């Protein structure tokens, strides 16, 4: 009977241990989830106006909160934030210059991304952005400053040209080749002066019809 009692008592101890460990794991998960929620809420309250990641995390939580747990949604938001470009991140910040100046104790997920983001912010004047599909590269060369150039001379207004009236061609028959051009104004003809009246010829005397005597 003693052996049977000992055998019966062993599984009871195992069951109680498993129940205790299960309760502890549930309490640990709940405490971890509650701590994450408290950290997020505290960060949202303190850095809602300055931190762009907190605003992005709030938006990401509203959209995809049903598909992720509290621990997974922070990691998913962090990976998505690291893939975003600088201009896209500035859309979630009220002050774009202070996007990367977030205290390390506010949100633990910003520790890895803050270093690269701060370097991008210091070299933003010469870096190529991938927001519009441009090729991104780690090596950024600063832009060359433009030298002092000569002032451009403004173009003066063009002088008005004299309008020439073009002669319109008439729809007449084409002139034959080699035709003499007509003078525009013909010369006036000289008027003939009135001449003196010619003298009439005198009437000759009639010859005598009588024959002369021959000797």
Swiss-Prot record:
A single cellular component GO annotation: sperm flagellum
Spans annotated as Disordered: 140-215
Basic residues: bias regions: 149-190, 197-215
Disulfide cysteine pairs (residue numbers): none
GO biological process, one term: sperm DNA condensation
Top-level taxon of origin: Eukaryota
Role this protein plays: Not known. Encoded in the intron of cAMP-dependent protein kinase regulatory chain type I.
Protein name: Histone-like protein 18C
Originating species: Drosophila melanogaster
Lineage summary: Eukaryota, Metazoa, Ecdysozoa, Arthropoda, Hexapoda
Gene: Mst77F
């Amino acid at each position: 009977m003693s052996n049977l009692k000992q055998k019966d008592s062993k599984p009871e101890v195992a069951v109680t241990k498993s129940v205790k460990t299960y309760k502890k794991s549930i309490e640990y998960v709940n405490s971890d989830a509650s701590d994450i929620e408290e950290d997020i809420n505290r960060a949202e309250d303190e850095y809602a106006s300055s931190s762009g990641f907190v605003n992005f995390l709030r938006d990401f939580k509203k959209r995809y909160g049903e598909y992720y747990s509290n621990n997974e949604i922070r990691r998913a938001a962090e990976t998505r934030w690291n893939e975003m470009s600088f201009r896209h991140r500035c859309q979630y910040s009220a002050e774009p210059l202070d996007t990367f100046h977030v205290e390390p104790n506010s949100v633990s997920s910003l520790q890895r991304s803050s270093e690269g983001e701060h370097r991008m912010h210091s070299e933003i004047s010469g870096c190529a952005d991938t927001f519009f599909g441009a090729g991104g590269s780690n090596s950024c060369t600063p832009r060359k400053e433009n030298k002092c150039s000569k002032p451009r001379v403004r173009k003066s207004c063009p002088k008005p040209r004299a309008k020439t009236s073009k002669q319109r061609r008439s729809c007449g028959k084409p002139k034959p080749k080699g035709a003499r051009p007509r003078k525009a104004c013909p010369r006036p003809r000289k008027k003939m002066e009135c001449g003196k009246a010619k003298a009439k010829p005198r009437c000759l005397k009639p010859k005598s019809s009588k024959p002369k005597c021959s000797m």
